[in-house]
Amino acid sequence: MNIHEYQAKAVLREFGVPVGHGFPIFKASEAEAAAKQLGGPVWVVKSQIHAGGRGKGKFKEASAGDKGGVRLAKSIDEVKEFAKQMLGATLVTVQTGADGKQVNRLYIEEGSDIDKEFYLSLLVDRATSRISFVVSTEGGMSIEDVAHETPEKIVSFTVDPATGIMGHHGRTVAKALNLKGEQAKQAEAMVAKLYTAFVAKDMDMLEINPLVLTKQGDLKCLDAKISFDGNALYRHTDIQALRDETEEDAKEIEASKYDLNYVTLDGTIGCMVNGAGLAMATMDIIKLYGMSPANFLDVGGGASKEKVTAAFKIITADPNVKGILINIFGGIMKCDVIAEGVVAAVKEVGLDVPLVVRLEGTNVEAGKKIIKHSGLNVLPADNLDDAAQKIVAAVKGA
């Protein structure tokens, strides 16, 4: 689960991490009061969306002005004007896609007198099952670009969970950022606090970009991005309360209500499969035959008729879907249950696109019989290769 920048900074503040002072606003009329509380003389007006590249992004609406999603204001009047322009407008960044995201909240933050910018992040290293630090002197820009163009400027290391964070980890970060004396001590203290926060809140990723050194000699997190482990949210009701569903895909939210593993993709063939591995293979073979999947959807091993019906409705709700491939290998999941769910869903929502069904495994003959006698226009398939070829041909011929 992702949260907004201002929420991430509030979480870090709980652990004593130095972050800038600011106030979130939801209406343009709140901008003046927020700016006055901060005092000035410089303010930063930041769009709050779940996507990076806000500063270099552009708004779709001409009324929002030519500047990006992060703007420097040198007067309260400018803060008010930016708030009016940005709230409700659609911001397009390198991470939002062409559709962009509507800005429904802003973060008004005090300006900082910046001397240097750094990059610092913590993430779960799946290869070592440890928390990894990634550090660079090249802050304020895409770490992917740094890795591609100047990989020697990136330092990374993992923390042994048996020992936890130790002093030498902080000193490693300080050395990587060329910090000495008092600034090195600040870095060491910050590293310990960030690690503690990461573990305590079950984070997946914590990115500070940029981490800045002010001209007063203080380290400060100028931006913060946090992603939490969804499987651990039951332990953190305070974090659950920070969820902003307007930033999430409506179909993915609906799928989560039925414990369906669903991810929206940008293709045109909807997929319903049981098992993550089989789902990946199904998407691969669709790609092999020249088309792209519209989603990843794993209904799991013990899906009910109602769950299958819900899954089918979610797929058909996507206007980009031009065909549907259902690929089920029945083990715990029975093929007749899938068939009943598909028939019920089609009769309820209708079917305007080609549908190919491949069933194999437990109760397969009963499942095929249900579909055959349903009166629906369904193309049966004998195996995965046959199913992929049939759905691709049907969509191209439609």
Curated annotation (Swiss-Prot):
The keyword Hydrolase does not apply. GO terms for biological process: succinyl-CoA metabolic process; tricarboxylic acid cycle. Belongs to the succinate/malate CoA ligase beta subunit family. Substrate binds at residues 274, 331-333. This is Succinate--CoA ligase [ADP-forming] subunit beta. PANTHER family: SUCCINATE--COA LIGASE [GDP-FORMING] SUBUNIT BETA, MITOCHONDRIAL, SUCCINYL-COA SYNTHETASE BETA CHAIN. It comes from Rhodopseudomonas palustris (strain TIE-1). InterPro entries: ATP-grasp, ATP-grasp_succ-CoA_synth-type, ATP_grasp_subdomain_1, SUCC_ACL_C, Succ_CoA_ligase-like_bsu, Succinyl-CoA_synth-like.
